[in-house]
Regions:
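Peripheral, non-AAA+ core regions of ATP-driven protein-machinery
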Residues: 1-125
Length: 126
């Protein structure tokens, strides 16, 4: 199942809308594409821990995450929340019908709590 979640990337004092597409299909691999930095790539482990600690099951399918536009570098752990929500939507654990109404950003701790992020006011302007 393909779903879309929205986040943002800060460049200087501007924010650019980032579309996070999550697709779930047969298999059991996780792929993250779209110019993520190492902190974004590491989000996979934080997301797994946060979901398991809170009683969600990890999908036993291939997960492909595309962060577009691909030419903008995605930096930091603030993509944890939209990636986790996208994963839950793609696995049909939660309803994804209203995802297009929200821009999600937030770092997840291993227990699933949402941690503060830098530049949150800039995210309101994409």
């Amino acid at each position: 199942m393909l779903i879309k979640v929205f986040g943002a990337a800060v460049q200087g004092i501007d924010a650019t809308l980032i579309t996070i597409e999550v697709n779930s299909s047969r298999g059991c691999m996780f792929y993250l594409v779209g110019l993520p930095d190492s902190a974004v790539k590491e989000s996979h482990q934080r997301i797994i821990s946060a979901l398991l600690v809170n009683g969600y099951k990890m999908p036993t399918s291939n997960i492909v995450v595309n962060m577009a536009p691909a030419d903008i570098r995605k930096e930091g752990s603030a993509y944890d929340l939209p990636l986790a929500i996208g994963l839950l939507g793609a696995s049909e654990t939660i309803s994804s019908e209203k995802f297009s109404h929200y821009l999600l950003m937030g770092e997840l701790s291993l227990d699933g709590s949402i941690q503060p992020i830098k530049g949150c006011l800039l995210y309101t302007s994409p």
